Amino acid sequence: MENGSYLYAVEMSTPLGKRRGQLELIVWENFLNGYLTMFTRCFPIQNGKRSGNHISFQGEMKTIMKSLSYQAEGKIAGKKISLVLTTDSGSYQTTGFLTGEKGEPITNE
């Protein structure tokens, strides 16, 4: 994965069914930042790190009923992303794919 901005369409498996959203990752060297859009809201990701194709970050999601702090761990393989978001309420498998809208890396040329 090169430095740049990547947009993924993601789907999270929850006890109430699948939830769809977007994950924007901004990669610079071994650091990540960006946004997770889920439950019709956009949340910044924090403390993002990358080692090869393995990524990790944390953040907080807010639903109608509560706020959920999470730790995300996963990997990127080609155009696919696979994450596990771990919260105090359990772990949620999240998968997705690179979209064509912003999926091409932004270079500093």
Give short role names for the model-derived ranges.
Residues 1-77, 82-109:
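Central antiparallel beta-sheet cores of small beta-barrel/beta-sandwich binding domains
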